[in-house]
Swiss-Prot record:
Molecular function via GO: asparaginyl-tRNA synthase (glutamine-hydrolyzing) activity; ATP binding; glutaminyl-tRNA synthase (glutamine-hydrolyzing) activity
Protein name: Aspartyl/glutamyl-tRNA(Asn/Gln) amidotransferase subunit B
Classification lineage: Archaea, Methanobacteriati, Methanobacteriota, Methanomada group, Methanococci
Gene3D superfamilies according to UniProt: 1.10.10.410, GatB domain, N-terminal subdomain (1.10.150.380)
Domain of life of the native organism: Archaea
UniProt keyword Nucleus present: no
Keywords from the UniProt entry: ATP-binding, Ligase, Nucleotide-binding, Protein biosynthesis
Gene: gatB
Length: 469
């Protein structure tokens, strides 16, 4: 019997704003490299009578930018007030979280509806297994993005988050996936039976969200298949086991007892404020991809790979400009940045910014290949060495240090070709019998004997001359 199974997923994504001070006080937002409970003040830890400062201006500006990038309608000339969201948990010393009403609404991103974008404060860090609470994080500005339940599969949700994190890297001023937490809402319909919505709280990675959805899809299907009922509940993600576990029944807005915070004046956005923020907005990844295809005439797949890393995309454009911005320069830049440099980055599991390489390094390398100072094979070795040395040595320095310049002495090349012919009797016979590809084996022998320092085109000419007579 065939199964009729479908799912709906919505996400509540929280990401930290990269500010120097917290949302409602002057305490530093650095909480990872300091002793617990040192970057705190009476506001951070909810002392009675401690009054919050007006919200951090940079945090508001970044929230506006995020809302605009997600194509939201901005809330203009209306009070945007902060509310107290009440719940009892050790990481929330005041017993409530300050959270704004929407700054932007009714947006869309990759075909997924964006319900709203708003600001709120991050709670502290509670470790139940140790019984400790660190309030250094408490009060750090958070932007929350709430989506409509438009995602229909774990794969779609994963891709949505990947693209959203890429957008965040382009925006800047956000701390990205390392600080991202997502509340994952999922409901399924199985053979005509609609299940209730389940929320899985505080999933802290894209991979985690994907695993949660895969697990919940199977778990909820099995419950309905056995004739059970899906409870409307909140569950926790047990990352070590890759399962979810029931925590409590699902809260509603009434359970949080929202009230306006009497200690904070409302924010009122106007068109002038929003336009000033818009003027500082970067090009979106999607627009950059489209421009790369149109402006440089490269393939969509190549544009997608380059644009996936903002710094890599910037280097590509600078290298193309240095190489003359012509078809040949663009082709070389694609080969050595999109293909070879990206290969080395993926192998080493690092981003471009971690290499300390500069556009000049890539230009120098490509020019060394163009003028045949080194072979393409040696070029691949040099790019690996540049990454390994974190950009401390230029291509020319590495070429000299490793003795990797192309062999220009014809007699030396002829000697290597003669030895390769002697060691490749079968390949030579096959070539003489009409198998042109067999010559590649002999060329490979020459490259091995010369440690890649021979220019392949020159080697082929010498080999043909010697074999064909």
């Amino acid at each position: 019997m065939s199964e009729d199974l479908s799912m709906k997923c919505g996400l509540e994504i929280h990401v930290q704003v990269d500010t120097n001070s917290k949302l409602f006080c002057q305490c530093p937002t650095n909480y990872k490299d300091v002793e617990p409970n040192t970057n705190i003040c009476p506001v951070c830890i909810g002392h009675p009578g401690a009054k919050p400062m007006p919200p951090n201006k940079k945090a508001i500006d970044v929230a506006i930018m995020v809302a605009k990038m997600l194509d939201c309608e901005m809330v203009i000339d209306k009070d945007i007030y902060f509310q107290r969201k009440h719940y009892n948990y050790p990481d929330l010393p005041s017993g409530y979280q300050k959270t704004s009403v929407p700054i932007g609404e009714h947006g869309t991103f990759l075909g997924v509806g964006i319900t709203e974008v708003h600001l709120e404060e991050d709670p502290g860090q509670y470790k139940p297994d140790l019984g400790t609470v660190d309030y250094n994080r408490s009060g750090t500005p958070l932007i929350e993005i709430v989506t409509d339940p438009d995602m229909k599969s774990p794969e779609e949700a994963r891709e949505f988050l990947r693209q959203l994190m890429r957008l965040f890297r382009y925006i800047g001023h956000l701390r990205g996936e390392g600080t991202m937490r997502a509340d994952t809402n999922i409901s399924i319909k199985y053979n005509g039976i609609q299940g209730n919505r389940v929320e899985v709280k505080n999933v802290n990675s894209i991979r985690g969200v994907y695993k949660v959805l895969k697990y919940e899809l199977i778990r909820q299907k099995n419950v309905l298949r056995r004739g059970g009922e899906i409870k409307m509940e909140t569950r926790a993600f047990m990352e070590s086991q890759m399962i979810t576990k029931g925590m409590r029944s699902k809260e509603t807005a009434d359970d949080y007892r929202y009230i306006p915070d009497p200690d904070l004046q409302p924010i009122v956005l106007n068109n002038n404020w929003v336009e000033k923020v818009e003027a500082q907005m970067p090009e979106t990844p999607m627009n950059k991809e489209k421009r790369f295809v149109e402006q440089y005439g490269i393939k969509e797949d190549d544009a997608k790979v380059l644009v996936s890393d903002l710094e890599l995309a910037d280097v590509f454009e600078k290298v193309v400009a240095e190489l003359g911005n012509d078809k040949n320069g663009i082709s070389l830049a694609v080969t050595w940045i999109r293909n070879e440099l990206k290969r080395v980055l993926v192998y080493n599991k690092i981003e471009f910014f971690e290499t300390n390489l500069k556009p000049e390094h890539m230009v120098e390398l490509i020019n060394s290949i163009k003028d045949k100072t080194i072979s393409q094979k040696i070029g691949k070795t040099i790019i690996e060495q540049m990454v390994e040395h974190k950009g401390e040595k230029t291509p020319k320095e590495l070429i000299t240090e490793m003795g990797l310049t192309v062999i220009e002495d014809t007699s030396e090349l002829e000697k290597a070709c003669e030895e390769a012919i002697k060691n490749s009797e079968k390949a030579v016979e096959d070539y003489k019998s009409g198998n042109q590809r067999a010559l590649n084996s002999v060329v490979g022998q020459v490259m091995k004997l010369t440690r890649g320092r021979a220019e392949p085109g020159t080697v082929v000419k010498i080999l043909k001359k010697k074999i064909d007579g």
